[in-house]
Amino acid sequence: MYHPRVQGVRVGQTLEVRNSDATLHNIHSLSTKGSGFNVGQPLAGMVYKYQLKAEEVMLHVKCDVHSWMTGYLGVVPHPYFAVTDAAGTFTIANVPAGKQTVQVWHEQYGALAQTVDVKAGGTTTVEFAYTGNEKPSQTAFAVQELVVPVDATAVQLIASRRRD
Protein backbone atom coordinates (compact mmCIF):
# COMPACT_ATOMS: atom_id res chain seq x y z
CA MET A 1 0.00 0.00 0.00
CA TYR A 2 1.09 3.56 -0.52
CA HIS A 3 1.33 5.10 2.93
CA PRO A 4 0.17 7.66 3.58
CA ARG A 5 -2.40 7.26 0.82
CA VAL A 6 -2.92 11.03 0.49
CA GLN A 7 -0.22 13.60 1.20
CA GLY A 8 0.94 17.08 0.35
CA VAL A 9 4.42 17.83 -0.97
CA ARG A 10 6.21 20.82 -2.45
CA VAL A 11 7.40 21.31 -6.00
CA GLY A 12 11.10 20.41 -6.04
CA GLN A 13 10.87 17.82 -3.26
CA THR A 14 12.06 14.31 -3.94
CA LEU A 15 9.48 11.55 -3.77
CA GLU A 16 10.94 8.30 -2.40
CA VAL A 17 9.01 5.06 -2.91
CA ARG A 18 10.29 1.86 -1.28
CA ASN A 19 9.26 -1.73 -2.03
CA SER A 20 8.94 -3.27 1.44
CA ASP A 21 8.12 -6.81 0.38
CA ALA A 22 9.44 -9.52 -1.92
CA THR A 23 6.68 -8.99 -4.50
CA LEU A 24 6.91 -7.27 -7.87
CA HIS A 25 5.44 -3.76 -7.80
CA ASN A 26 5.60 -0.79 -10.09
CA ILE A 27 5.19 2.92 -9.44
CA HIS A 28 3.07 4.51 -12.14
CA SER A 29 2.26 8.21 -11.90
CA LEU A 30 -0.69 9.39 -13.94
CA SER A 31 0.51 12.96 -14.33
CA THR A 32 -1.42 15.48 -16.37
CA LYS A 33 1.50 17.93 -16.15
CA GLY A 34 4.23 15.94 -17.90
CA SER A 35 5.77 14.61 -14.70
CA GLY A 36 4.85 11.00 -15.36
CA PHE A 37 6.93 7.93 -14.62
CA ASN A 38 6.38 4.18 -14.64
CA VAL A 39 9.09 2.18 -12.90
CA GLY A 40 9.25 -1.46 -11.84
CA GLN A 41 10.37 -2.56 -8.38
CA PRO A 42 10.79 -6.34 -8.52
CA LEU A 43 12.84 -6.75 -5.31
CA ALA A 44 12.28 -6.02 -1.64
CA GLY A 45 14.19 -2.97 -0.45
CA MET A 46 14.34 -1.26 -3.84
CA VAL A 47 13.96 2.52 -3.63
CA TYR A 48 12.87 4.83 -6.42
CA LYS A 49 13.51 8.57 -6.10
CA TYR A 50 11.91 11.20 -8.30
CA GLN A 51 12.04 14.98 -8.05
CA LEU A 52 8.56 16.47 -8.38
CA LYS A 53 8.99 19.25 -10.92
CA ALA A 54 5.53 20.71 -11.49
CA GLU A 55 2.51 21.80 -9.47
CA GLU A 56 -0.24 19.21 -9.69
CA VAL A 57 -3.31 18.76 -7.50
CA MET A 58 -3.68 15.80 -7.44
CA LEU A 59 -0.95 13.53 -8.81
CA HIS A 60 -2.35 9.98 -8.88
CA VAL A 61 0.22 7.23 -8.23
CA LYS A 62 -0.64 3.55 -8.55
CA CYS A 63 0.73 0.03 -8.92
CA ASP A 64 -0.37 -1.59 -12.19
CA VAL A 65 0.31 -5.04 -10.73
CA HIS A 66 -1.97 -4.57 -7.70
CA SER A 67 -5.05 -2.47 -8.51
CA TRP A 68 -5.82 -1.67 -4.85
CA MET A 69 -2.47 0.09 -4.42
CA THR A 70 -3.08 3.74 -5.15
CA GLY A 71 -2.11 7.08 -3.65
CA TYR A 72 -2.38 10.80 -4.30
CA LEU A 73 0.08 13.67 -3.96
CA GLY A 74 -0.92 17.31 -3.80
CA VAL A 75 2.19 18.92 -5.33
CA VAL A 76 2.23 22.67 -4.60
CA PRO A 77 4.86 25.45 -4.83
CA HIS A 78 4.36 26.70 -1.24
CA PRO A 79 4.25 25.34 2.34
CA TYR A 80 0.52 26.00 2.95
CA PHE A 81 -1.14 22.59 2.83
CA ALA A 82 -2.43 19.92 5.18
CA VAL A 83 -4.15 16.54 5.22
CA THR A 84 -7.19 16.23 7.46
CA ASP A 85 -7.28 14.12 10.57
CA ALA A 86 -9.86 11.36 11.12
CA ALA A 87 -12.48 13.97 12.10
CA GLY A 88 -11.93 15.92 8.87
CA THR A 89 -10.19 18.90 10.49
CA PHE A 90 -6.81 20.49 9.93
CA THR A 91 -4.82 23.62 10.75
CA ILE A 92 -2.42 25.48 8.49
CA ALA A 93 -0.14 27.86 10.41
CA ASN A 94 1.56 31.08 9.29
CA VAL A 95 -0.64 31.78 6.27
CA PRO A 96 0.02 35.36 5.03
CA ALA A 97 -2.63 37.95 5.85
CA GLY A 98 -4.99 38.97 3.05
CA LYS A 99 -7.33 37.23 0.65
CA GLN A 100 -6.38 33.59 0.14
CA THR A 101 -8.01 30.80 -1.83
CA VAL A 102 -8.45 27.57 0.10
CA GLN A 103 -9.08 24.43 -1.93
CA VAL A 104 -9.98 20.99 -0.60
CA TRP A 105 -9.82 17.77 -2.59
CA HIS A 106 -11.51 14.43 -2.00
CA GLU A 107 -10.70 11.28 -3.95
CA GLN A 108 -14.31 10.51 -4.75
CA TYR A 109 -15.91 13.98 -4.83
CA GLY A 110 -13.19 16.19 -6.32
CA ALA A 111 -12.28 19.76 -5.37
CA LEU A 112 -14.09 22.61 -3.64
CA ALA A 113 -12.66 26.11 -3.12
CA GLN A 114 -13.41 29.22 -1.07
CA THR A 115 -11.78 32.62 -0.80
CA VAL A 116 -11.09 33.72 2.76
CA ASP A 117 -9.78 36.94 4.30
CA VAL A 118 -6.94 36.03 6.64
CA LYS A 119 -6.37 38.61 9.40
CA ALA A 120 -2.84 39.18 10.70
CA GLY A 121 -2.38 37.54 14.10
CA GLY A 122 -5.84 36.00 14.04
CA THR A 123 -7.51 32.70 13.32
CA THR A 124 -9.75 32.17 10.31
CA THR A 125 -12.19 29.29 10.22
CA VAL A 126 -13.54 27.85 6.98
CA GLU A 127 -16.04 25.04 6.59
CA PHE A 128 -16.44 22.85 3.50
CA ALA A 129 -19.26 20.36 3.00
CA TYR A 130 -19.53 17.77 0.27
CA THR A 131 -23.19 17.26 -0.60
CA GLY A 132 -22.84 14.17 -2.78
CA ASN A 133 -23.97 16.14 -5.83
CA GLU A 134 -20.37 16.76 -6.87
CA LYS A 135 -19.15 14.97 -9.98
CA PRO A 136 -17.64 11.68 -8.81
CA SER A 137 -14.03 11.11 -9.81
CA GLN A 138 -12.94 8.13 -11.89
CA THR A 139 -12.14 6.00 -8.85
CA ALA A 140 -14.69 4.23 -6.70
CA PHE A 141 -12.64 4.39 -3.50
CA ALA A 142 -13.71 6.77 -0.74
CA VAL A 143 -10.97 7.99 1.59
CA GLN A 144 -10.94 9.81 4.88
CA GLU A 145 -8.35 12.42 3.91
CA LEU A 146 -8.66 15.72 2.13
CA VAL A 147 -5.65 17.61 0.84
CA VAL A 148 -5.88 21.33 1.36
CA PRO A 149 -3.53 23.54 -0.64
CA VAL A 150 -3.77 27.24 0.23
CA ASP A 151 -2.59 29.74 -2.43
CA ALA A 152 -0.18 32.04 -0.86
CA THR A 153 -0.96 33.89 11.80
CA ALA A 154 -2.90 30.64 11.87
CA VAL A 155 -5.76 29.46 9.74
CA GLN A 156 -8.01 26.80 11.16
CA LEU A 157 -10.01 24.98 8.54
CA ILE A 158 -12.82 22.50 8.99
CA ALA A 159 -13.67 20.13 6.16
CA SER A 160 -16.82 18.04 6.28
CA ARG A 161 -17.19 14.87 4.30
CA ARG A 162 -20.48 13.58 3.01
CA ARG A 163 -21.89 11.03 5.40
CA ASP A 164 -23.59 8.06 3.73
Task: Identify the residue ranges that each predicted region occupies.
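Extracytoplasmic copper-binding redox domains, predominantly the cupredoxin/blue-copper superfamily
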Residues: 1-164
